[in-house]
Amino acid sequence: MVLLGRSAAELKAWVEAQGQPGYRGQQLHQWLYRKGARSLQEITVFPKQWRAALADVEIGRSEIRYRHDAQDGTVKLLLALADGETIETVGIPSSDRLTVCVSSQVGCPMACDFCATGKGGYRRNLACHEILDQVLTIQSEMGRRVSHVVFMGMGEPLLNLPAVLQAITCLNRDIGIGQRHITISTVGIPQQIQRLAQHQLQTTLAVSLHAPNQALREQLIPSAKHYPLSQLIADCRAYVQQTGRRITFEYTVLAGVNDRPQHAEELAQLLRGFQSHVNLIPYNPIAEAAYQRPTDQHLRQFLSQLQALGVTASIRRSRGLDRQAACGQLRQAQLIA
């Protein structure tokens, strides 16, 4: 049994099964989620003899393999999991919030052509406790409370929906992060957007679009061959109608590839009458791809074209770029010496 991810009631039942009074469950809950205990030996309110007897009980915490601090304050961690697999997670601070970009899988099966994670292949899904651990570890390393969580790290969250939903429940119930402060990002998986809508969450759905037509999207996102853009947009419209929540569309801008005037016109036509917002993300370079990052001037020009066509859009500035901690740059292994 892994303790991280258990509710206060479940922890109470567990300590009572160990022959301890029920209030120890609330103490355990506080030490796991508020104080970030990495082992039961740290929980000094427990009797020493009982702590010794629990030496083999797994809390579910990872080991930090390295930490890199970017010039803008962003922190990237490589975490080693219990089975030796590794993932990266990123803490993004600002004056009034701390956002954690969490991974949902070890690697990613989507193999997007401009993303470092997909270049390394896919290993497995993360368990709920491995997602929660990323939040608690960033919180401890950065010395402040996490306020926002975005499922935009390694992996495709909708291919690991049960663990992601369980993690969202725990983030809200046990760590105190409101659902409206949680974002789930997806490239689009058939039937999964509909399944997510059925849960009626107050989270934000971010759809990685990256192209305004089917042919170009298939070049950039191989899985798009199995999920026509027309169906994806139809599912997104149904999601908005069912949940009342606005969708964010992520659009990585690749110089000379998807940023021409005709692309702006196609995107405006695609999203006409849609309750949505488009985030333009300038491409963050990786060694395995030959794409180019657009100039700031060209990016602003593309934004202006979209806005003139009636698209609600903005430019999302990348954080942690100098430490390969930006969108599309996360990996399973350390590249920076």
From Swiss-Prot:
Note describing how the cofactor binds: Binds 1 [4Fe-4S] cluster. The cluster is coordinated with 3 cysteines and an exchangeable S-adenosyl-L-methionine.
UniProt keyword annotations, A-Z: 4Fe-4S, Cytoplasm, Disulfide bond, Iron, Iron-sulfur, Metal-binding, Methyltransferase, rRNA processing, S-adenosyl-L-methionine, Transferase, tRNA processing
PROSITE patterns per record: RADICAL_SAM (PS51918)
Residue numbers annotated as active site: 88, 327
Positions that bind [4Fe-4S] cluster: 108, 112, 115
Annotated localization: Cytoplasm
Listed GO CC annotations: cytoplasm
SS bond partners: 101-327
CDD domains linked: Radical_SAM
Residues holding S-adenosyl-L-methionine: 155-156, 185, 208-210, 284
One protein family per Pfam: Radical_SAM
Reactions this protein catalyses: adenosine(2503) in 23S rRNA + 2 reduced [2Fe-2S]-[ferredoxin] + 2 S-adenosyl-L-methionine = 2-methyladenosine(2503) in 23S rRNA + 5'-deoxyadenosine + L-methionine + 2 oxidized [2Fe-2S]-[ferredoxin] + S-adenosyl-L-homocysteine; adenosine(37) in tRNA + 2 reduced [2Fe-2S]-[ferredoxin] + 2 S-adenosyl-L-methionine = 2-methyladenosine(37) in tRNA + 5'-deoxyadenosine + L-methionine + 2 oxidized [2Fe-2S]-[ferredoxin] + S-adenosyl-L-homocysteine
EC assignment: 2.1.1.192
Domain Radical SAM core: start-end pairs: 94-322
Enzyme class: transferase
GO biological process terms, semicolon-separated: rRNA base methylation; tRNA methylation
Similarity annotation: Belongs to the radical SAM superfamily. RlmN family.
PANTHER family (alphabetical): 23S RRNA METHYLTRANSFERASE, RADICAL SAM CORE DOMAIN-CONTAINING PROTEIN
Function: Specifically methylates position 2 of adenine 2503 in 23S rRNA and position 2 of adenine 37 in tRNAs.
Misc remark: Reaction proceeds by a ping-pong mechanism involving intermediate methylation of a conserved cysteine residue.
Protein name in the entry: Probable dual-specificity RNA methyltransferase RlmN
Species this protein is from: Thermosynechococcus vestitus (strain NIES-2133 / IAM M-273 / BP-1)
UniProt lineage: Bacteria, Bacillati, Cyanobacteriota, Cyanophyceae, Acaryochloridales
